[in-house]
Structure formats: C-alpha cells, structure tokens
Amino acid sequence: MTSINTANINFKWDPKSLEIRTLAVERLLEPLVTQVTTLVNSSNKGPSNKKKGRSKKAHVLAASVDEATQNFLEKGEKIAKESQFLKEELTAAVEDVRKQGESMKMASGEFAEDPCSSVKRGNMVRAARALLSAVTHLLVLADMADVYQLLLQLKLVEENLMKVRNAGTEQDLGIQYKALKPEVDKLNMMAAKRQQELKDVHHKDQMAAARGVLQRNVPMLYTASRACLQHPDVAAYKANRDLIYKQLQHAVSGISNAAQATSSEDSSFSQTAGGGELAYALNNFDKQIIVDPLSFSEERFRPSLEERLESIISGAALMADSSCTRDDRRERIVAECNSVRQALQDLLSEYMGNAGRKEKSDALNTAIDRMTKKTRDLRRQLRKAVMDHVSDSFLETNVPLLVLIEAAKNGNEKEVKEYAQVFREHANKLIEVANLACSISNNEEGVKLVRMAASQLETLCPQVINAALALAAKPNSKVAQDNMDLFKDQWEKQVRVLTDAVDDITSIDDFLCVSENHILEDVNKCVIALQEKDVDGLDRTAGAIRGRAARVVHVVTSEMDNYMPGVYTEKVLEATKLLTETVMPRFTEQVEAAVEALSANNGQPVDENEFIDASRLVYDGVRDIRKAVLMIRTPEELDDSDFETEDFDSRSRTSVQTEDDQLIAGQSARAIMAQLPQEQKAKIAEQVASFQEEKSKLDAEVSKWDDSGNDIIVLAKQMCMIMMEMTDFTRGKGPLKNTSDVISAAKKIAEAGSRMDKLGRAIADQCPDSACKQDLLAYLQRIALFCHQLNICSKVKAEVQNLGGELVVSGLDSAMSLIQAAKNLMNSVVSTVKASYVASTKYQKSQDMQSLNMPAISWKMKAPEKKPLVKREKLDDGQTNKVKRSSQKKHINPVQALSEFKAMDSI
C-alpha cells in the first residue's frame, strides 16, 4: 500500500479486491478453473459403499492442476520482479499462490488415493477454493499494476497540460507543447489497449469518449493559450482557454475512471444505455396489453394500462406542441392519441368479457390486433413529427456560424453578441431535436452516439462564441483569426458527426416523405413570394429549397453506400444526379433572374411560368428520388397514408433487369411479364397448355384419394397449387408479383418435395417388391432433380429496353424454362403418387404402419361430393320472384351419384 500512497495517484482500486475487470484476466484464469472443477467433479459426492481404490483419472487431473499452478508461479515471480508498482503486494500474492498450491497438491493427492471419502473430498474442495482465490488475487494485482502504469502516464500528461496552460511566454508555450504531444500519444496508445481489454461495454464507451476529447482539445488548448499570451487584455481568450482546460481535466478523469472500471461523474462520458424513453414506453405497452384471460383482473390491469398510456400520450403531446411541428401533423398526433385511448377501452371491455376463459375469443384477438395497429400508427406519426424537426433544424447548419464570424471579422462587438444569441439558440435547437430523435428510436447504440455527440456540441458552443468575441476585439490579429478558424472547423466537424448520428437512428423513408412535403410547401411559398414581389421572402425560401435538396442528396447518397452496387443503386444515384446537375442549376438560374428583375425598379417582367416549371421540377426530382429509394420496399413496408401507389405507373426509360425484389420504374416484374410481345405470349400460352395437361393428370390422380390421412396427397396438392401460381406469373397474372416471390415459391416447392421424398423413401424401405421399390426411388430422384431445376429457373428476368423510342420487353427464354421445369416436376409428382400407392399395397396384411415404424399414410378412396337426391329451392326474403338458373333446378339421378365411387383396378 505504501507504493500507492507515495505516488500521489488517484487510485480507486482496493488491492484486496477479487473483482475481475478485464478479459485478459478471465482468459488466464479460465483453464485453471476448468481443471479444478473437473477434478472436484471427478467422482460422485458424498460417502459411498464402493470398494476403496486408486483413481487414475483423479491423479492425472491433480497433476495437471499442479502443473498449471507452477506455471502461474513462474509468471507471477517474473511480474513481481519486473514491476515497478505494487512490488510488495505482488510478491506476497505469489507466496500465497505457492502456499495454496502446496495445500491443493496434498489434498488432491489424498483424494486421488481415496476418491470415495467425503472428508477428503471436502478438504480438496476447500483447498481448491483457496487456490483459485489466491491465483485470482495474483492476476488482479498484475492487472492493477498495468493500470497503475497507465495512471502514472495520465498524471504526467495532466502535469504537462497544466504547464501548457500556465506558460508565461510564447517560447515557453512552444517548448511545453512539444513535450506534451508525445506523452499524449503514448497515453492514447495505453488507453486504447486498456479499452480493448475492459469487460464492461459502458466503460469501453467511457474510455473511447474521453480519449476523443483529449485528442481533440490538446491542439485547441495550445491555440487558445497562444492567443491569450498575445492578447492578455482580451477576457474572451482567457475564458476560452479555461473552458478547454476544464474539458481536458474531465477527459483525464474519464480515462482514469474507465481504466479502473469505475463510474464517471461527467455526463458526457457516462451515457445511459438503452433506446429512447418514448420508444421504450410504447414497446413496453405493446407487451403489457397481451394478458391471459384466466389471470385478467380489471382492478389490477385497467389502472396500470391506462396510466402507461397516459404517460405515452403526455410525451406525444409535448412533441405535438413543439414549434417545429406542422399543424396538420399536430392534428394527426391528437387524432391518433384519441384512437389509441378508444382502442384500449375496447380492449379492456373484451378482456372483461373473456375473464376466466382458457382461450381468447376471436373478438379479443381482433381487439388486441387493433390496439397494436393503433400504437403503430401513433408511433409512425411521432416519427414523422420528429422528421419535421430534423428536416427544419438540420438545414444549412453553418449559416448562424458564418454570420457570427462575419460580424466578428468586422469588429462589431454589439452585432457579435446579438448573433451569438442566435447561434446559441441554433445550437440548443440542434441538441433538442437530436434528443427528440433519440426518444422514439429503438437503436440503443445509435442513441448512445447521438447523445454523446449532442453533449460535446453543447460544450463546444460557448467556446465558439468566446472565439468570436475575441476576434471582434482584435479583428486584424492573425492569431485571433487562426483561433476562430480552428473553432469553426471543430464546430462544423461536430455538427456533421451529430447529423450523421441522427440520420443513423431515423428512417430514410420518413425523412424523404417529410422532405418531399416540406419542399412542396416551400415551392408554393416561392411562387406566392414571386407573385407578391417579395424579394427577401423569395430569396430566403429559395435558399431553403436548395438546402433541403442538397440534404436529400447527401442522405440518399450516404444510404446507397450501405448497398452493393447494382440496378437499384444505379437508379437511385441516377435520380440524385439528375436533381443535382440538371434541375437545381435551372432552379437557381430562375431564382436569380427573378430576384434581379424584382430588385430592379425599371419594371422588368418576370417569366412566371418558367419559374413555376423550374420549381415544380425540383419537387418532381425529390419525388423521383424517393420513388427510386422505395423500389425495393415490400407493400407492407410502404406507408399507405403517405404514398400513393398509382404514382408507380410510370414506364422505364432505360434498360434494366428484374433481380431479387426490385421493381422497375415502379412496376412489378409480373407487370413487365404482361407486356411481352404477342408472339412471345403465344409461345408461353402453348407451353402453359401443355402444363395444364399434366396438371389435369395430377388432379385426376389426387382427386381419387382422401387426403385427411395421407400426407403425400396433401403435399402433391400444395406443389400443384404453387406451380400454377408460378406459371401464371409468366403470363403477368396471379398472386406472385416480383422475382423474389417466384424464388420464394420455388423454395416452398423444394421443401414440399423434400418432405415427399422422406415419406416416399420410408415406404420404399419397407416394400418387399424390389421392382416397385426401384420405380418409386427413381421417381423420387426425378422430383429432387426437377425441384432443383425449378429453383434455378425461378430467377425469371424480364428485360425492358428502349429501342428507337419504342419500349421492348423480352423474357421468353426464362419464362419457357420455368414452365418446362414445372411441367416435368408435375409429371414426376403424378408418377410418385401412383408408385407410392402401388408400393403400399405390397405390405403383408399382418403388418400395419406402426409395426413397420411408418408414417401415417392411409390410402382411402375419396367419397363423392354429397348431393341431395331432390334439390330444394330456398326462397330468400325479397328474392321470391328471382329467376333461378336452370342448372340449379336440375335433379340428380341417385344411380349416377352412386356411380361416382370409382374403384381402382386391383394391382
């Protein structure tokens, strides 16, 4: 303990502690724990009546434990000898391990000689515990020695930071800063190594944040101190230097706490884990509404659920009442809150009606589904409200800063103070919106990053203002300008970090939807400003449109970096390029012309139609980008309330292919197949007709059998139905819309084929007739082959080309291959059903399915459809005078009905 006290280090670690704080200690300790545990469990516990004797296994295990202990002793002695810190404690710990190792060796040897003795087992268990404690203590002390070395380096950096801050001359400042830099680099390397070894994720994050602050603020301390020395009469420089130094002190404290795995008092380094509060409340509420009717109690559940919901609604109301929330969005949030309230009351009423029942009624399940849907709708409106804020606040984020710097360069301190207030409000708004985005996000890691970035931005804000005030005091000073540039760069970098972090926890779909609406609002404002000859309003709103368009391009381009290059990314990037290189320059040109014409007092006319067209193109360009991004979304992922599906009816202008789940120019792959030329459609129809013949054969075969006890018939029907859907796809019809749907259908067929193969082989294995057995196995092999073929052919591709201004769609080869593969598979299924029945008839009558360990397959003839001998006409109310179709009046001949029982030829 003397080494700790004399070093003047803030050491918060008790040397007697056995708490393991790093992965390295765990890794070193794990083999010994395993060996000791294996030895202790090598025979049954408690007294035994078995004959006493030697246990070879116990002797071997005891020897391995002793060997591991000796290994720890060698390493421990080396560490104690080489370590400059905790030498006495390490030496004592090594001796303790040696002592406990000898005790363990003796106890394990006695136990190995008499493994049935409970007394000797107990002695060995106690010795094992003591040995593990001693080894753990040694490893923890070695870990503490490493931390102690890091803390010494930290202390050295802290002292050097103080020397830089207190330097009396520029020459002294340069010397001290030059000495500081290598020490900071060394500390950073040691801290990074420690960060990797820490067990606790929170402490890892704490270390990373503190290291970042240290690296970022050291150069700023030098610049601020230099400015202080050159202009000691400017109070803002001194204030800035002190703020930076305080940040560095917090960083040093954060590294110290993280290295010792203790909590930090600084909120910027100790972010709370978990997602947003509102998101958590909604998730928890969705779980709480599902209750077992047997255990439902109105007195217990109603107050709890109502209280939780009102808490959620209070949070939603705060968001709705925020200044950036649009009026229509506010109304939607209020409406959704009322709907959620009503849905909860309906749900509670259903629970009361189902109380005491074992099973939930259909009405209760419907009420639960409706409740879940309403909370989902509320969640969506809250997300859109947050995106309103993000879209407005994270727009031209550098403008308040540039205005502030411009005022400072002019030396106008009064203006600087006014713009400083605007800048501070802007910074607070960014932080507020970032926290709002966190509140409805489930992305825990993302929320942590946003809150950390927001905290650092909050710290940087007063430093930027001080730098501007200092520049205003000495506008001609090179040092003052350099100081301002440094803080400007840091601010812009930190805002980018916060912006990217917010983008990561918000949905690009929501962002594009909201941005599209906002641009439409701004376009309308622009046109009104033009008509009212409001030059300032026109210029300001046009600037907002340019900023929104640039933000859309940035967000979408960043999102495309997450995808592999392909048709989808090409279409999206093509839309962004069109907006950036063609649409926006034209819009800017029209705005400049309009502003120039309105500013001139000579009554120069403005081409209003040209301006409106250019503005409309901006909106259309953003909308096209959004449509391109949504190409790969499924119908379930699309927000029906904000997206009109008819807008997807546009035609492709370029040559693309349907791959995976992609939509081409908003069209499904099925729709494109429907556009094939008539000659190709005729060929496909011919193939489909041939396929229908095979389908008829399968229908005739499976219709004979009752499928209630025959899985082979059930599987055959399923495969037939899926294959029909796949062939319908080639004609531009049916439920399958995209290539991914066809691929999914092929996988289902393959799964059904695999199950049929399993059933068929079980029948074949028990079939005594070798010829029947070989036939069945051959047909099963064909099913596997054709399932594989169908899987390959399912990746149907339709190509859309623009040749000489004429749209040409081609995809005949892939469609024909798909139909042919389905036809072959259908034929094999028919043959397999027949062969399975034939093989089943070969079993000896004395053997049943259970005795043969067979699956339950019962070959029973299907009863004919029940039909009345005399058709009775029902006279519905109000329908007495309705003329019946002649087919409904037709009487069924009883003999004909009985004849529908078709007997198969005996085999």
Curated annotation (Swiss-Prot):
Q: What happens when the gene is disrupted?
A: Embryos during somitogenesis initially show slight deformations such as indentations in the spherical morphology of the embryo, additionally ruptured weak points are evident in the external epiblast from the 12 somite stage onwards. Embryos proceed to show tissue rupture and swelling of the yolk resulting in lysis of the embryo and a complete embryonically lethal phenotype by 24hpf.
Organism the protein comes from: Danio rerio
Region of interest: Disordered: 870-895
What is the gene name? Answer: ctnna1
Any single GO molecular-function term of the entry would be: beta-catenin binding
Give a yes or no for keyword NAD in this entry: no
Membrane disposition: Peripheral membrane protein
Q: Where is the composition biased (Basic residues)?
A: 882-892
- Localisation: Cell junction, Adherens junction; Cytoplasm, Cytoskeleton; Cell membrane; Cell junction
Identification of the protein by name: Catenin alpha-1
Q: What's this chain's function?
A: Associates with the cytoplasmic domain of a variety of cadherins, forming catenin and cadherin complexes which are further linked to the actin filament network and is thereby involved in cell-cell adhesion. Required for embryonic development, via maintenance of adherens junctions that facilitate the maintenance of the epithelial barrier.
Q: Does the keyword Iron apply?
A: no
Compositional bias annotation for Basic and acidic residues = 870-879
GO terms for biological process?
adherens junction maintenance; cell migration; cell-cell adhesion; chordate embryonic development; tissue homeostasis
What PROSITE patterns does this protein's entry cite?
VINCULIN_1
Sequence similarity: Belongs to the vinculin/alpha-catenin family.
Q: Which PANTHER family match?
A: ALPHA CATENIN, CATENIN ALPHA-1
The entry's keywords: Cell adhesion, Cell junction, Cell membrane, Cytoplasm, Cytoskeleton, Membrane, Nucleus
The terms describing its cellular component in GO are: actin cytoskeleton; adherens junction; catenin complex; cell cortex; cell-cell junction; microvillus; nucleus
Give the multimer and partner information: Interacts with ctnnb1, jupa and cdh2. Interacts with cdh1 during early stages of oogenesis, interaction is no longer present when oocyte develops into the unfertilized egg.
> What's the chief localization of this chain?
other
Q: In which tissues is it expressed?
A: Expressed in the skin (at protein level). Expressed in the ovary.
Alphabetical list of Pfam families matching this protein: Vinculin (PF01044)
